[in-house]
Curated annotation (Swiss-Prot):
Its EC number is 4.98.1.1. Pathway: Porphyrin-containing compound metabolism; protoheme biosynthesis; protoheme from protoporphyrin-IX: step 1/1. Keywords: Cytoplasm, Heme biosynthesis, Iron, Lyase, Metal-binding, Porphyrin biosynthesis. This is Ferrochelatase. One of its GO terms (biological process) is heme biosynthetic process. It is found in: Cytoplasm. It catalyses: heme b + 2 H(+) = protoporphyrin IX + Fe(2+). It is an enzyme of class 4 (lyase). SUPFAM superfamilies: Chelatase. It comes from Vibrio cholerae serotype O1 (strain ATCC 39315 / El Tor Inaba N16961).
Length: 320
């Protein structure tokens, strides 16, 4: 990239509803579930199902879940994302803006804010360590669509993934060790990743390979033998088969296998959100304890930790 042109950073993530209300959640889910990267069914079949059944029934339920985790400053995903933006800007001494694939601030808004600061080159960092067409590629699609609305298109550099970056693995290991120091080490470290339909992987999505590599490297960094770490997939919906083993089913089975104290980390999530704070730290903890488990400790996402910000700065610096 041209070093004489001002460079800025766009941190991209999935997005979040604007408020923990049925109306706001419905608007967010509608945009999210309309993306063919997320659901690749025929639009003739999917859209009537989405608008006739899924959105009317799921939106009020999901809104209640958001209410249980909502912070004074807003949605956890947005709160931590803003902190990441501010800390990365301070560390890198470059303009940094947020762009969400769905919801606000949009990818287009993020690019425009950077251009208003005189930025001509943008490094796009999707905060998905493991590549998937359902997440990372959706950022690229959304950005390409956004650029059509700009009179001047900036020079762009995309960071596709960082699932095996040494600083990423070190940051994960540090967070696990901090949990062990506070709560003691459990019988097993379970790495729960957001799932995707199995068919997507069979059609070439490399996401499961990236998840496996991250898990292996994290186990090595922690000095854990193979029988002390496990990988599962969460957040599946619909009747189609998703990547397995499923996190919730595993929670039911582990106590019967002698696992009474469990540590859980979600390496695919760069910030805590509904899927980590509610689905894992609340729902799945309840499943594990109800099934005979004795202790469940959720290891928070990297969020705006110093090690995470240093990782981001390194990713941007190396790829410029």
């Amino acid at each position: 990239m041209n070093n004489h042109k001002k460079l800025g950073i766009l941190l991209a993530n999935l997005g979040t509803p604007q408020a923990p209300t049925s109306q706001a959640v419905k608007a967010f889910l509608s945009q999210f579930l309309h993306d063919q990267r997320v659901v690749d069914m025929s639009r003739w079949l999917w859209c009537p199902l989405l608008h006739g059944i899924i959105l009317p029934t799921r939106s009020p339920k999901v809104a209640k879940l958001y209410q249980s985790i909502w912070m004074d400053e807003g949605s956890p995903l947005m709160v931590y994302s803003r902190r990441q933006r501010d800390k990365l800007a301070e560390l890198s001494q470059r303009p940094v803006e947020l762009g969400m694939t769905y919801g606000e601030p949009s990818l287009l808004e993020g690019v425009r804010k950077l251009q208003q600061q005189g930025v001509e080159q943008i490094v796009v960092l999707p905060l998905y360590p493991q590549y998937s067409a359902t997440t990372t590629a959706a950022v690229f699609d959304g950005l390409a669509k956004a650029l059509r609305q700009l009179p001047v298109v900036p020079e762009l550099h995309f960071i596709r993934d960082y699932h095996d970056h040494p600083l990423y693995i070190q940051a994960l290991a540090k967070s696990v060790r901090a949990s062990w120091q506070q709560h003691g080490q459990g019988d097993l470290l379970l790495c729960s990743y957001h799932g995707i339909p199995k068919r997507y992987a069979q059609n070439g999505d490399i996401y499961p390979e990236h998840c496996l590599k991250t898990t292996e490297l994290l186990a090595q960094a922690l000095g854990l033998p193979q029988d002390k770490v496990m990988m599962t997939y969460q957040s599946q919906f619909g009747k189609e088969e998703w990547l397995q083993p499923y996190t919730d089913k595993t929670m039911e089975a582990l106590p019967r296998q002698g696992i009474k104290k469990l540590d859980v980390i979600c390496p695919a999530f760069s910030v805590d959100c509904l899927e980590t704070l509610e689905e894992i730290a609340e729902q799945n903890q309840e499943i594990f304890l109800h099934s005979g488990g004795e202790a469940f400790h959720y290891v928070p996402c990297l969020n705006d930790s110093q090690s995470h910000i240093e990782l981001m700065a390194a990713l941007v610096k190396v790829d410029c």
